[in-house]
Amino acid sequence: MRSDVQHFKCEIKDGIATVALDRPERKNPLTFDSYAELRDWFRDLHYDDEVKAVVFLPNGGNFSSGGDVHDIIGPLTKMTMKELLTFTRMTGDLVKAMIGCGKPIISAVDGICAGAGAIIAMASDLRVATPEAKTAFLFNRVGLAGCDMGACAILPRIIGQGRAAELLYLGRAMSAEEGQAWGFFNSVVPADELEATAQKLAAKIAAGPNFANMMTKTMLAQEWSMSLEQAIEAEAQAQAICMQGQDFHRAYHAFVAKEKPVFEGD
């Protein structure tokens, strides 16, 4: 998997890709280029066996302030409807690429996490925050609808319809305490422990059965649109496929030998 990216930071080590936006002096806003490069990177990640998990870090005390006011918001006001639709589809494609990449993604949120930055955290599988984290889906504060990049579909699944409606209608920031109580954040830790906590979670995931983890991520995404009967059948088929895998056999033999299984992702 390539780490020679231009519009964000990326390091790959021990099966974990650690990424972060790289404009800390402006609270890490997204640009047209960083949107597109992140989208393409997560698409490529789906087919890469080297990376087992992803950690998305803050930079300079902030996660992301969302779309850059000067580089994105200003130009959008001059675009045609067709050009605007091309842009909104492209930003949505980033979320689809994150959800479809097959690798668990952990967002480590500190400071400002707003707009598209909040969407990136939302589209992740696990979220860890500092007490200083402020997460805001503030689209209505710039005269836009809250239905951006899948927010109206995904956010209610995480925190509930009423709480999602409050954040999307008001555009206010959700505190770290609220985020943990509502189920948005899996844990809240001191700022000096944030990266280590996220990396520890990623290491545990990376040491697990990675093909099976991919199946779990796929089912978590797909079963929302299935009936209960369809979901149970889909899980039966997914589990039967995993039972054919070598990791299942490794786990069995390790259990019999009273050893810890070493998974290889096949």
What are the roles of these predicted feature ranges?
Residues 94-100, 108, 114-168, 182, ...:
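CoA-thioester-processing core
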